[in-house]
């Protein structure tokens, strides 16, 4: 943990490219004026230098690392790994590997980011596949959901590893001593769900892990805030996340239309507290919870939404800052070791 962390940024990733990155750092400076950080911007100097010149406060906390090579959003992971050396994404991750930076943020190609991250940083011992986390707003704070897209299919062992990583991640980002953990299922009864989910449930119970496991939970439990960490495969998690984002935009649109539907509605809206309306807007705006961590790598890799604007990218930077300052890597170790030992004993007993 460092007093002033350095965050490495793939400045060429995402739909909006360098403009969103520079604007994002500016928003982060305004949103968290007490957070001191420096940024390594990996990208094309011809594009980044003019943007930094227009934002002197951003330029003051940034160091530009020039490269004209970038990973395209359409690149397949295998192709990206072969061609990515020297790219903005590769160099940004390499800065974490070398110890120059405590975390890396990218809005680029998710598959490529994961593949390159695995090549450069390698997987943590005891983790077979990385998982992408998402911070889900609830009336009680936030629920961590994983996986939300890294693995379309998972086996029971991988789901247990996700539970271990998600629990440690929740403690690192949101605090608390014993966040509750649940497996997403179609019902809470023991016989509900597919074989993989039921097997994962039994593995968690038998392994005697140091987590507050609550058993099966259902989709409606996520937004209620009754569970801190929700574990699922990437196929299910991604659909749930995208559905929630779409619903949030729909409801936000309804609220906006209701407050502007007539002169009387506009006058009533004007009487409401502007602060309250702003807080409501932020709670319903996916940009303010943008950013997921690729858990399981030997380094902090934060994935920003590919379409994130400056406000959204700032949220991903904020998450990277918190993770860089946390002891997540140490917190995850004990339960991974305990589960690995349990699996070895199970294999030995079966042989």
Swiss-Prot record:
Cross-referenced SUPFAM superfamilies: Isocitrate/Isopropylmalate dehydrogenase-like
Key word Ribosomal protein present: no
Principal EC category: transferase
UniProt GO molecular function: phosphate:acyl-[acyl carrier protein] acyltransferase activity
Cell compartments where the protein resides: Cytoplasm
Catalysed reactions, semicolon-separated: a fatty acyl-[ACP] + phosphate = an acyl phosphate + holo-[ACP]
Record EC number: 2.3.1.274
One Pfam family this sequence matches: FA_synthesis
Pathway info: Lipid metabolism; phospholipid metabolism
GO terms classed as biological process: fatty acid biosynthetic process; phospholipid biosynthetic process
Assigned keywords, A-Z: Cytoplasm, Lipid biosynthesis, Lipid metabolism, Phospholipid biosynthesis, Phospholipid metabolism, Transferase
The keyword Lipid biosynthesis appears for this protein: yes
Broad class of where this protein is predominantly found: cytoplasm
InterPro entries per record: FA_synthesis, Phospholipid_synth_PlsX-like
GO CC terms: cytoplasm
Gene3D superfamilies: Isopropylmalate Dehydrogenase (3.40.718.10)
Family per record: Belongs to the PlsX family.
Subunit and interaction comment: Homodimer. Probably interacts with PlsY.
Functional note: Catalyzes the reversible formation of acyl-phosphate (acyl-PO(4)) from acyl-[acyl-carrier-protein] (acyl-ACP). This enzyme utilizes acyl-ACP as fatty acyl donor, but not acyl-CoA.
Protein name: Phosphate acyltransferase
């Amino acid at each position: 943990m460092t007093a002033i962390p350095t965050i490495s940024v793939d400045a060429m990733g995402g739909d909006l490219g360098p403009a969103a990155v520079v604007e994002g750092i500016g928003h982060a400076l305004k949103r968290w004026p007490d957070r001191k950080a420096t940024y390594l911007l990996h990208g094309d100097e011809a594009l980044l230098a003019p943007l930094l010149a227009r934002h002197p406060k951003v330029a003051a906390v940034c160091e530009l690392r020039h490269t004209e090579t970038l990973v395209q959003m359409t690149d397949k992971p295998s192709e990206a790994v072969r061609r990515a050396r020297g790219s903005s994404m590769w160099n940004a991750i390499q800065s974490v590997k070398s110890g120059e930076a405590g975390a890396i943020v990218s809005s680029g190609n998710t598959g490529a980011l994961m593949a390159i991250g695995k090549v450069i940083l390698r997987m943590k011992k005891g983790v077979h596949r990385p998982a992408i986390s998402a911070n889900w707003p609830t009336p009680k704070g936030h629920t961590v959901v994983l996986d939300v897209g890294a693995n379309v299919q998972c086996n029971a062992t991988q789901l247990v590893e996700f539970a271990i990583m998600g629990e440690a991640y929740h403690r690192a980002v949101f605090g608390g001593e014993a966040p509750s953990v649940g497996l997403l299922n179609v019902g809470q009864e023991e016989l509900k769900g597919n074989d993989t989910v039921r097997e994962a449930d039994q593995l968690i119970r038998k392994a005697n892990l140091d987590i507050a496991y609550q058993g099966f939970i259902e989709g409606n439990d996520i937004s209620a805030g009754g569970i801190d960490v929700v574990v699922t495969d990437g196929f299910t998690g991604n659909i749930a996340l995208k559905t929630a984002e779409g619903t949030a935009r729909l409801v936000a649109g309804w609220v906006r239309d209701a407050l502007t539907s007539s002169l009387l509605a506009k006058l009533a809206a004007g009487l409401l507290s502007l602060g309250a309306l702003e807080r409501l807007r932020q709670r319903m705006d996916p940009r303010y919870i943008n950013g997921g961590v690729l858990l399981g790598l030997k380094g902090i890799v934060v994935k920003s939404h590919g379409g994130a604007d400056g406000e959204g990218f700032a949220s991903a930077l904020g998450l990277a800052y918190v993770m860089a300052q946390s002891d997540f890597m140490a917190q995850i170790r004990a339960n991974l070791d305990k589960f690995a030992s349990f699996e070895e004993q199970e294999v030995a007993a079966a042989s």
